[in-house]
Structure formats: structure tokens, C-alpha cells
From Swiss-Prot:
It comes from Synechococcus sp. (strain CC9605). This is Nucleotide-binding protein Syncc9605_0652. Belongs to the YajQ family. SUPFAM superfamilies: YajQ-like (SSF89963). GO terms for cellular component: cytosol. Keywords: Nucleotide-binding.
Length: 165
């Protein structure tokens, strides 16, 4: 039997679910009467989405469709960081949507401090873009998971728990 148990807190999303969501959004935009002739393009790059469309109003509608479809596919809306729209050539509007992945040092430190202040029986270590929480009993780790889930709204990133051992 192991003398210590641990798990990792990470911020990640399923890229394939995002691709499927964007396919649904493109299909929905192509079928909707008010968006059909807007010539909307949604491009997925490595760390961001680029939405190019005809006007601010259609951009808002496309954002709404994106949020709805992402929610239906169990993607957290916290992965989307909507930047300010900018004008593109030919009376078009472009918006960059950055995709949040991984815990920044600032968020990892905040999470680490939060767990250390509340639970004295666990140790917290920041490991790159994840936070490892270690404890002698599984009950302590369950308490840490409940604490982090309860405080997740204070953080700007979605959290997942991996490598529970």
C-alpha cells in the first residue's frame, strides 16, 4: 500500500471536442437565415480562434452560437478569452479568441496558497503548468478536491483533476 497519495490539478480542454464544436457552429451559421449571407469564417489555430464576419451584430450572434454549442459539448466557457473586435478589410469585423490552456504561474501560486492555508495535512508543489497535491490519506486529497472545486469560480480557468494515485 502506498504511503502517500497524490493528484494533479491542470487546466486543459479536449481539442477534438473543440473541433466538433466549431464544425457545429459553422453548420449552424450556414443554416441560420440571419447569418447565411454574412460570409462568416471561423479559423482554428494552435492557441486561438479567429472569427471574421460582416458586422458587429453578426459577430455577437456567432459568439452566442459558439458559447451555446461549447456548453452542449461539455467545454467550459472559461477556455475562451474573447479579445476586442477589430475592423478587417472590406467592411468586415475580425475577433481573436485566445484559448486558455495550462495554469499560469500566478494562478498556480494562488491555487497553491489557497490549498495550503485551508488544509495543513497536504503538500502542494507547482510543476510547470500543473499543481501536484500530495497527502498521506485519500480523505485529505478528497477534501482538497472539494476545496478547489468550491473555489474554482474565483479562478479564470477551468480545472481538471488527473493522475489520482
Amino acid at each position: 500500500m502506498a504511503s502517500t497519495y497524490s493528484f494533479d490539478v491542470v487546466s486543459d480542454f479536449d481539442r477534438q471536442e473543440l473541433v466538433n464544436t466549431l464544425d457545429q457552429v459553422r453548420r449552424d451559421v450556414g443554416n441560420r437565415y440571419d447569418l447565411k449571407d454574412s460570409n462568416t469564417e471561423i479559423d482554428l489555430e494552435e492557441t486561438e480562434l479567429v472569427i471574421t464576419t460582416a458586422s458587429d451584430m453578426t459577430l455577437q450572434a456567432v459568439e452566442d452560437v459558439l458559447r451555446t454549442k461549447a456548453t452542449k459539448r461539455n467545454l467550459s466557457l472559461k477556455i475562451f478569452d474573447f479579445q476586442t473586435p477589430e475592423t478587417a478589410g472590406g467592411n468586415r469585423v475580425r475577433q481573436v479568441v485566445k484559448l486558455r490552456k495550462g495554469l499560469s504561474q500566478e494562478i498556480a501560486k494562488k491555487l497553491s496558497k489557497m490549498v495550503r492555508d485551508e488544509l495543513k495535512k497536504v503538500t502542494v508543489a507547482i510543476q510547470g503548468e500543473s499543481v501536484r497535491i500530495t497527502g498521506k490519506s485519500k480523505d485529505d486529497l478528497q477534501a482538497a478536491i472539494q476545496l478547489v472545486k468550491g473555489k474554482e469560480d474565483e479562478l479564470d480557468v477551468p480545472l481538471q483533476f488527473e493522475n489520482y494515485r
